[in-house]
């Protein structure tokens, strides 16, 4: 009888592991939420793994720290405008999405749609008196 390839099992387990929430996802992995930094649009966008309702309960408080933002940088980009759901699964890691016209969901929109997953309209980033806003 052949020996079972345990490395394959480990590979499968690591692929389905959702408990590691602080690591930055790579383009090959599934991306759930991305942190948009409009002040440095040419940089690779950072994606953050989330882990269910317990994580979201104190959402506005724990986001900046989890995202690795300092107080100064979060003030500069405007936290509420900077944190958005990912536009597409792999989209936020393609360089062209990192420009000013990055497609995004508006906050009011995903708040509603996150509970009942309906069709989400597309929107765009716009600069408005030194604040980045998500527009339809």
From Swiss-Prot:
GO terms for cellular component: extracellular region; host cell nucleus. It comes from the Eukaryota. Keywords: Host nucleus, Secreted, Signal, Virulence. Residues 1-21 form the signal peptide. Its main location: secreted. It is found in: Secreted; Host nucleus. A motif (RxLR) lies at residues 43-46. Induction: Expression is up-regulated at later stages of infection. Has a conserved RxLR motif that acts to carry the protein into the host cell cytoplasm. Lacks the 'so-called' EER motif, which is found closely behind the RxLR motif in most of RxLR effector family members, but the presence of an EER motif is not always essential for the translocation of every RxLR effector into host cells, or for inducing a hypersensitive response. Effector that partially suppresses the tobacco programmed cell death induced by cell death-inducing proteins. Belongs to the RxLR effector family. This is Secreted RxLR effector protein 63. It comes from Plasmopara viticola.
């Amino acid at each position: 009888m052949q020996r079972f390839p345990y490395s394959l099992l480990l590979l499968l387990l690591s692929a389905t592991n959702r408990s590691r929430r602080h690591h930055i996802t790579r383009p090959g992995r599934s991306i759930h939420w991305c942190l948009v930094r409009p002040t440095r649009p040419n940089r690779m966008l950072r994606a953050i793994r989330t882990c269910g309702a317990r994580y979201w309960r104190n959402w506005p408080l724990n986001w900046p720290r989890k995202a690795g933002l300092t107080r100064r940088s979060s003030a500069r980009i405007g936290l509420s405008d900077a944190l958005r759901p990912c536009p597409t699964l792999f989209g936020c890691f393609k360089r062209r999405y990192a420009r000013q016209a990055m497609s995004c969901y508006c906050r009011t929109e995903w708040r509603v749609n996150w509970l009942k997953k309906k069709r989400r309209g597309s929107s765009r980033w716009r600069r408005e008196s030194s604040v980045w806003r998500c527009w339809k």
